[in-house]
């Protein structure tokens, strides 16, 4: 089980995964196995900086930063 913050779409149906190649993938929140692949940081300030950088590079659209524990509780 992970702890920290992740990027999700506003509907909380997808999470952001950063690949080793630096690409961005979106995985469903329907299965808990996908949570282990999510990009997760414990510091929300760092997540905000990363969010701005990814938005500036047009790698992601509007996303929310949420505590991953909220998503674990959803399933």
Explain the meaning of each model-derived region.
Residues 10, 29-31, 48:
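Intrinsically disordered, low-complexity serine/threonine-rich segments
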